[in-house]
Amino acid sequence: MRTISAQEITDTVARLCIEANTRLPQDVQAALDKARQEEPWPLAKNTLDLLWSNLSAAREKDLPICQDTGMACVFVELGTDVHIDGSFEAAIHEGVRRGYTDGYLRKSIVADPLRRGNTGDNTPAAIIVHLVDGDGCTITVAPKGFGSENMSRIQMLKPADGVEGFKKFVVDTVRLAGSNPCPPIVLGIGVGGSFDKVAYLAKKALLRPLDIPNPDPYYAQLERELLAAINAPVSYTHLTLPT
């Protein structure tokens, strides 16, 4: 049995909140750089170049990449042989509170969605815990801005809709979102399960490295087809995708 102090959890979450808002993971940086190098449309290329300059400035000055510093989504893989010395959830919330305060990050979270009173420290966080074997504890902080979060959709498809119905729903979702999620975007797609489970799967999918395709060849091909359809001219996105 391994014991981890609540203070260590707090310190880690606070650091990750700041890093996640001021740095991009290497796979995302590489994807953005590749996009700006290959983009043929001058206006789009100029936009990507501006995003790249903004990213460099944020890194050099330790400033947020975006003014929307989002809701802190904290994903935890917690080993069954780990004992947390103290309150685990309280430690995470304290880490978010400290990270958003020490990092001078915008506080966006309200205590009640209808009364709209800001909590003033960006808590509570959204905490997702997955139990795994062993004595490890892996914490990932993903700030989720609501420009993209508010464009999320769920659809209960009929069996008869098949894979074509699924692909059409994904492409239509991106089309309807337009510029609201602040492109370029990363799609987190969940398929199957209950209403709540599929939303969890979609959120978790955002953590996958961008440069690693799905290990299942069927879904890897589906990813390629969706990417091609989404990036196609608008007038073509209603067509049946190649299979």
Predicted regions and their residues:
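Acidic/polar, glycine-rich intrinsically disordered N-terminal extensions of enzymes
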Residues: M1-L48
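A generic, well-ordered mixed alpha/beta core segment in the N-terminal half of proteins
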Residues: G70-V132
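Conserved small/polar residues in nucleotide/adenosyl-binding loops
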Residues: T237-T243
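Catalytic or ion-translocation cores adjacent to nucleophile or general acid/base/metal-coordination motifs
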Residues: K197-A232
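Conserved mixed alpha/beta catalytic, RNA-binding, or beta-rich assembly cores of soluble enzyme
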Residues: G136-P209
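Polyanion/phosphate-binding surface patch
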Residues: L55, E60-G79
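Translation machinery proteins
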Residues: E39-L63
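A generic local secondary-structure boundary/capping motif
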Residues: K61-P64, L114-N118, A125-V132, V174-S179, ...
